[in-house]
Regions:
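Outer-membrane beta-barrel initiation region
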Residues: 2, 22-99, 103-106, 173-193, ...
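Transmembrane beta-barrel strands of outer-membrane/channel proteins
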Residues: 36-40, 66-72, 93-111, 145-153, ...
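Intrinsically disordered, low-complexity linker/loop segments enriched in Gly/Pro
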Residues: 130-177, 182-189, 193-195
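Extracellular loop and loop/strand-boundary signature of outer-membrane beta-barrel proteins
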Residues: 67-68, 112-118, 161-168, 210-220, ...
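Outer-membrane beta-barrel translocator/channel fold
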Residues: 94-138, 349-351
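C-terminal outer-membrane beta-barrel translocator/porin domains of Gram-negative envelope proteins
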Residues: 26-30, 36, 174-314, 322
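Gram-negative outer-membrane beta-barrel proteins
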Residues: 42-44, 60, 76-78, 91, ...
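Bacterial N-terminal signal peptides
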Residues: 8-19
């Protein structure tokens, strides 16, 4: 495999899980983790996909009202400084900085085929400002509101297999706003023992460029709008110590393009705050403008201290495709088998 292709795959492993750092409120607990995950395709030739990063959450960072959240991969870094009670007793502020190499790579996958001639390398950096508000401080189940503004800049370059006549998307800035309500929530761990959540979100993205690219057949939309909701329930049976994790995520979009649409596929549970997992498929294989995704995980401990666990995953999705990236049928189902260790996960997924 040529050198640039190797680097693209290796850095995807490093960077695609960094959105783990983007949470809905300031985490009050001290955490220091190493997360490793890899998605192996048993057939075909997809782009390598996975993540490897060091995660730190440090309350009382130089001051009692400061919390540092940091995720570091070999070529990418994502961080946020949380300031508790910055605007009021129950309103916090977060200042974020992220960036590095290969973070904005784009892999074209159409009809289940990875098209390297239409794929390219991307680099990016961003700053963000977030406001977190707790609406019901006296309640056992918190209701949090989030408003986040993001300024992101992306640059693109060819790799060794990009087609010579394929025009790259122009370097551009993207200004985004995300807002949402979350009732409940989950700890930022692989599979929490107890959790519940109901949440609703909106994200609008506004770009500085809206030119065509590729073979003149695709376009950067000047603005895109995403709306989605999520529900989850996690519980551990007290006698058996078996756990289940049930989740439902659904979303729609307006004027989405290849860079802003929902992309489903693979089994990488720490790849995002709301991972669109579909085991047995390539990472981000399915591009959907609308979707519904139902997932069930059942976790069985393999030793008394629960350092090793067996995890079975079943997910099913109904999608409406982004134009130009359609696949046969509008429903997809995947089954996955994973062995998990406290410090990471090695996973093998069955074919669809």
């Amino acid at each position: 495999m040529p050198v640039i292709s190797i680097w693209r795959g290796c850095v995807l492993m490093a960077s695609c899980g960094i959105t783990f750092c983007s949470m809905g409120q300031i985490d009050p607990f001290s955490r220091e983790l190493i997360q490793v995950g890899y998605n192996l395709a048993l057939q075909g030739h997809p782009p390598l996909s996975g993540y490897a990063f060091y995660y730190l959450n440090k309350p009382n960072f130089f001051n009692t009202n400061l919390t540092l959240r940091l995720a570091v991969a070999p070529t990418y870094m994502d961080s946020e400084l949380g300031i508790s009670h910055a605007l009021s007793e129950y309103t916090d502020l977060g200042i974020g900085l992220a960036g590095g190499g290969f973070a904005d790579n784009y892999a074209e996958i159409r009809q289940g085929r990875y098209l390297q001639g239409e794929s390219f390398t991307g680099y990016g950096g961003e700053v963000s400002l977030s406001i977190y508000h707790l609406f019901n401080p006296a309640s056992k189940i918190p209701l949090n509101g989030v408003i986040r503004g993001i300024a992101h800049y992306s640059t693109y370059s060819r790799d060794d297999r990009t087609a010579p006549d394929f025009a790259l998307a122009k370097d551009h800035g993207t200004f985004s706003v995300r807002t949402g309500l979350r009732w409940g929530g989950r700890e930022p761990t692989l599979f929490p023992s107890l959790a519940m959540e109901l949440s609703a979100w909106y994200e609008g993205s506004f770009r500085t460029e809206n030119e065509t690219y590729g073979f003149g057949d695709r376009k950067l939309e000047p603005q895109s709008h995403l709306l989605w909701g999520a529900a989850l329930l996690a519980y551990t049976l007290p006698e058996w110590k078996h756990s289940f994790y049930l989740s439902l995520t659904a979303g729609t979009s307006v004027e989405a393009d290849r860079f802003s649409t929902y992309r489903l596929g693979a089994l990488l549970p720490m790849v995002a705050e709301y991972p669109l997992s579909l085991p047995g498929y390539y990472y981000q294989e399915i591009s959907a403008k609308d979707f519904g995704l139902l997932g069930l995980n059942y976790i069985i401990p393999l030793d008394e201290k629960q350092r090793w666990n067996f995890n079975g995953t079943l997910t099913t999705a109904v999608v409406s495709y982004l134009p130009g990236l359609e696949q046969p049928g509008n429903s997809h189902t995947g089954v996955g088998v994973t062995s998990n260790r406290v410090s990471g996960a090695n996973s093998v997924s069955t074919s669809r």
